[in-house]
From Swiss-Prot:
Keywords: Early protein
Protein name: Gene product 16.6
Stated family: Belongs to the phi29likevirus gp16.6 family.
Top-rank taxon, per record: Viruses
UniProt organism field: Bacillus phage PZA (Bacteriophage PZA)
Protein backbone atom coordinates (compact mmCIF):
# COMPACT_ATOMS: atom_id res chain seq x y z
CA UNK A 1 0.00 0.00 0.00
CA UNK A 2 1.38 3.39 -0.92
CA UNK A 3 1.45 5.92 1.87
CA UNK A 4 2.04 9.66 1.91
CA UNK A 5 3.86 11.29 4.79
CA UNK A 6 2.37 14.59 5.91
CA UNK A 7 3.87 17.17 8.24
CA UNK A 8 1.46 19.76 9.56
CA UNK A 9 2.51 23.32 8.68
CA UNK A 10 1.00 24.64 11.91
CA UNK A 11 2.00 22.20 14.64
CA UNK A 12 4.62 20.02 12.88
CA UNK A 13 2.71 16.84 13.68
CA UNK A 14 3.64 14.03 11.28
CA UNK A 15 1.08 11.50 10.06
CA UNK A 16 0.36 9.17 7.18
CA UNK A 17 -2.48 8.81 4.71
CA UNK A 18 -3.11 6.32 1.97
CA UNK A 19 -2.33 7.65 -1.49
CA UNK A 20 -5.97 7.95 -2.54
CA UNK A 21 -7.49 8.47 0.91
CA UNK A 22 -7.90 12.24 0.68
CA UNK A 23 -10.26 14.50 2.56
CA UNK A 24 -10.68 17.20 -0.07
CA UNK A 25 -9.72 18.39 -3.50
CA UNK A 26 -6.56 17.51 -5.34
CA UNK A 27 -4.37 20.52 -6.06
CA UNK A 28 -2.50 21.14 -9.29
CA UNK A 29 0.57 19.45 -7.82
CA UNK A 30 -1.44 16.30 -7.04
CA UNK A 31 -1.05 17.01 -3.34
CA UNK A 32 -3.95 15.78 -1.23
CA UNK A 33 -5.67 18.32 0.97
CA UNK A 34 -5.87 16.84 4.43
CA UNK A 35 -6.63 18.09 7.90
CA UNK A 36 -4.18 17.54 10.74
CA UNK A 37 -5.55 15.07 13.30
CA UNK A 38 -3.62 16.85 16.06
CA UNK A 39 -4.63 20.50 15.63
CA UNK A 40 -7.37 20.33 13.00
CA UNK A 41 -5.79 22.83 10.62
CA UNK A 42 -5.60 22.15 6.91
CA UNK A 43 -2.20 20.63 6.21
CA UNK A 44 -0.66 21.08 2.77
CA UNK A 45 2.92 20.11 3.57
CA UNK A 46 3.44 16.67 2.11
CA UNK A 47 6.53 14.59 1.69
CA UNK A 48 6.28 13.13 -1.78
CA UNK A 49 8.18 10.03 -0.70
CA UNK A 50 5.85 7.10 -1.08
CA UNK A 51 6.49 4.03 0.99
CA UNK A 52 5.33 0.53 0.27
CA UNK A 53 3.71 -0.74 3.45
CA UNK A 54 2.98 -4.43 3.70
Amino acid sequence: MKMLTHTCFYCSFSFFTRKFDVFGAITKKDTPVVFCPACGNQSLTVSHIEEEIG
